[in-house]
Amino acid sequence: MRIVVGISGASGIPYAVRFLENLRGHDTYLVISEAAKKVIQYESDENIEYIRSLASHNYEDDDFSAPISSGSFLFDSMVIVPCSITTISKIAAGISDTLITRAAAVSLKERRRLIVVPREMPLSTIDLKNMTYLSENGVIVAPASPGFYTKPKSVDDMVAFVVSRILDLVGVGNDLIKRW
């Protein structure tokens, strides 16, 4: 399975790291935004080199010659995790000024699965309208909202819950959580 992964500048880097760790064996194409690089320094015990090592292919966010910027390059899904509100707003407005937003635009025009994982809270009416617009256009909006019916005992358990759901959405089997 070919999966494009974008990491934008929202809080929630542990979701991205755990997601990539669980995609081993799949063909992954990773883009880390400039803002995400800063968030990684503040929020993660992992360094950028480790995160990049989890992907099969790595691209800079300004590399419009990357294959994922073209509709003729076939991939199964794109996941932006975490997805900043700025990135959601750009995608909703059709702005493709970064490789992440360009690959998202390709996903939309080619009718490929696009999943955005916002972590922001609270949300403004504008944020909600942008997410609604994306959903109406086939994007899966999967907020990073852990379930508590699994009785998580740690932050890692809560991260596992969200990542398990994202993996389910892209069709990658996993046993990160106890299922009903």
Swiss-Prot record:
It comes from the Archaea. Dimethylallyl phosphate binds at Y149, R165. Keywords: Flavoprotein, FMN, Prenyltransferase, Transferase. It catalyses: dimethylallyl phosphate + FMNH2 = prenylated FMNH2 + phosphate. Pfam families: Flavoprotein. Disulfide bonds: none annotated. One of its GO terms (molecular function) is flavin prenyltransferase activity. InterPro entries: Flavin_trans-like (IPR036551), Flavoprotein (IPR003382), UbiX-like (IPR004507). FMN binds at G9, A10, S11, S33, S84, I85, T86, T87, R119. It is an enzyme of class 2 (transferase). The keyword Transferase applies. Its EC number is 2.5.1.129. NCBIfam families: PRK06029.1, ubiX_pad. Flavin prenyltransferase that catalyzes the synthesis of the prenylated FMN cofactor (prenyl-FMN) for 4-hydroxy-3-polyprenylbenzoic acid decarboxylase UbiD. The prenyltransferase is metal-independent and links a dimethylallyl moiety from dimethylallyl monophosphate (DMAP) to the flavin N5 and C6 atoms of FMN. Belongs to the UbiX/PAD1 family. This is Flavin prenyltransferase UbiX. It comes from Thermoplasma acidophilum (strain ATCC 25905 / DSM 1728 / JCM 9062 / NBRC 15155 / AMRC-C165). The gene is ubiX.
